[in-house]
Amino acid sequence: MLAQIRTYTINRGEMDNFLKELQAVAIPMHEKVGIPIVASWVDRGQNEFIWVRRFEDQADREQKLNAFRELPEMADIRSRVAVKIAKMEIHDVEGAFAPSPARG
């Protein structure tokens, strides 16, 4: 399994608008091409949005990201979502070991 951890620094005062537009535009696009979003967090103190996308392997990643980039909705991403991002940090990582079982 591969994951992509993305950290966006959002323009000051735009976090709520960013989240609204992300859910309206970007999330449906990910669903359309089969890219699972496995987690997301907001650090309001740092004005950061952090999320994780998952891929089966490198070939799956390339195929799905190419399909994503070719969607006609990409113009909406740029005009409604990307303009609210001041900085973007992306890490492509692979699994190291299975998660620990929950302890009760």
What are the functions of these language-model segments?
Residues 11-13, 58, 95-96:
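Generic structural motif
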Residues 9-19:
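Short, surface-exposed ligand-recognition loops at beta-strand->loop->(often short) alpha-helix junctions
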Residues 42-44, 84-104:
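Long, low-complexity, Ser/Thr/Gly/Pro-rich intrinsically disordered segments that act as flexible linkers
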Residues 17-39, 54-91:
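An amphipathic, aromatic/His-enriched active-site/gating alpha helix that lines ligand/cofactor pockets
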Residues 3-8:
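Active-site-flanking beta-strand signature of metal-NTP-handling nucleotidyl enzymes
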Residues 45-50:
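The conserved glycine-aromatic submotif of the RRM
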